[in-house]
């Protein structure tokens, strides 16, 4: 189902940028968005949202043409920069002194950020990391089609940094007709492993696609997480049934809306199914435990182009002596060891070793070593 949708391709490294004088400096979020727009990760988007699409996405979770899209992908600039720009111009997109692309300006507009916060994040509380970032970024949005004119050279995980066209090819090569995507920003603990393997029972392959773009400061660093995924896959997963590749986007922490966004993006990478667990892409207590699953009832599988797989919170049951969920285990809470990425992070930062019911010992070793290194460099 998923590979039917056509991928946008806005990469052109021969594009002449020398004649273009004006430039917009991209922050890290806009830079990662530029790449994903150009390589088709954000298909059907061809650029940063214009006003009519932006308004439509914020209000209805759809583009102006009715296609499902739940997160506004925007290019914010300061009022000073906006005053120098005109609709119809072509402007360079730069970061760290390098020109990475161009935007053909179709729209310059001032968004209602409070409305965006309320509708996208369901809160205007600046303690929410997504809202905080929204308010910190400049106040004018520039919309228009983009071209990526230079690929990033400093990808921290080059062998795992694949474009959607490459992951699709990889799945095809492996003969996978059905592929389930799993999004994570945490090391994989036993609850994740249980969910992934349950899903793997009904599809041909698992696409483990950890997010390595900008996350909040107390999330475990991407390089440590990547090493933990490698050691886990090496020791506990069948090599011919799992594929690991990074998702270079920034984390929005938009809960339900981000769950839809993550599913649509994984469709572009070639997945037919997508795992949605408890509090997907949530943070703190801003969203209900299963709100990110309930939002999918607003859309048909046909219009999403990917099938969501919903999983309840899983735990280790000391009576069952196995991983389980309330769907499969009759025992009370007193017999359940509740696992979460937050809990694992907490234990590790306090110098405690999570028990084997929490995380595989090989993974724990990697995390302890990684966090010690982090403390030293701080």
Swiss-Prot record:
Signal sequence coordinates: none
The EC number(s) this enzyme carries: 2.7.7.4
Catalytic activity of the protein: sulfate + ATP + H(+) = adenosine 5'-phosphosulfate + diphosphate
Domain of life: Bacteria
GO biological process entries: hydrogen sulfide biosynthetic process; sulfate assimilation
Keywords from the named record: ATP-binding, Nucleotide-binding, Nucleotidyltransferase, Transferase
Xref: Gene3D superfamilies: HUPs, Sulfate adenylyltransferase
CDD domains: ATPS
Pathway(s) of this molecule: Sulfur metabolism; hydrogen sulfide biosynthesis; sulfite from sulfate: step 1/3
GO MF term set: ATP binding; sulfate adenylyltransferase (ATP) activity
Matching HAMAP family: Sulf_adenylyltr
Family statement drawn from the similarity comment of this UniProt entry: Belongs to the sulfate adenylyltransferase family.
PANTHER family membership: PTHR43509, SULFATE ADENYLYLTRANSFERASE
Protein name as annotated: Sulfate adenylyltransferase
Organism listed in the record: Bacillus thuringiensis subsp. konkukian (strain 97-27)
């Amino acid at each position: 189902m998923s590979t039917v949708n056509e991928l946008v391709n806005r990469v052109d490294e021969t594009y002449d940028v020398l004649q273009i004088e004006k430039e917009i400096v991209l922050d890290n979020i806009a830079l990662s968005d530029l790449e994903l727009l150009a390589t088709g990760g954000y298909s059907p988007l061809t650029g940063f949202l214009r006003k009519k699409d932006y308004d439509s996405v914020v209000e209805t979770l759809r583009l102006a043409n009715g296609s499902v899209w739940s997160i506004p992908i925007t290019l914010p600039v300061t009022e000073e920069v906006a005053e120098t720009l005109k609709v119809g111009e072509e402007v360079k997109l730069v970061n760290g002194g390098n020109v990475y692309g161009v935007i053909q300006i179709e729209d310059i507009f001032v968004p209602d950020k409070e409305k965006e916060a309320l509708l996208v994040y369901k809160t205007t509380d600046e303690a929410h990391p997504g809202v905080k970032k929204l308010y910190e970024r400049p106040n004018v949005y520039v919309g228009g089609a983009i071209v990526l004119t230079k690929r990033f050279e400093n990808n921290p995980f080059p062998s795992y940094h694949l474009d959607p066209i490459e992951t699709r090819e990889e799945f095809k090569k492996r003969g996978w007709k059905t592929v389930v995507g799993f999004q994570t920003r945490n090391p994989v603990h036993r609850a994740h492993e249980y969910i992934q393997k349950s899903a793997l029972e009904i599809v041909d392959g698992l696409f483990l696609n950890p997010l390595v773009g900008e996350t909040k400061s107390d999330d475990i660093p991407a390089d440590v997480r990547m090493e933990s995924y490698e050691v886990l896959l090496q020791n506990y997963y069948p090599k011919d049934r799992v594929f690991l590749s990074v998702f270079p986007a920034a984390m929005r922490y938009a809960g339900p809306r981000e769950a839809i966004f993550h599913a649509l993006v994984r469709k572009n990478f070639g997945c037919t199914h997508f795992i949605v667990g408890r509090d997907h892409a949530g943070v703190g207590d801003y969203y209900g435990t299963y709100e990110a699953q309930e939002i999918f009832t607003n859309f048909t599988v046909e219009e999403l182009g990917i099938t969501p797989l919903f999983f309840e919170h899983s735990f280790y049951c000391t009576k069952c002596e196995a991983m389980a969920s309330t769907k499969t285990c009759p025992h009370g809470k007193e017999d359940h060891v509740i696992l979460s990425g937050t809990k694992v992070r907490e234990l590790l930062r306090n110098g405690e070793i999570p028990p084997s019911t929490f995380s595989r010992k090989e993974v724990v070793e990697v995390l302890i070593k990684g966090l010690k290194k982090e403390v030293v460099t701080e």
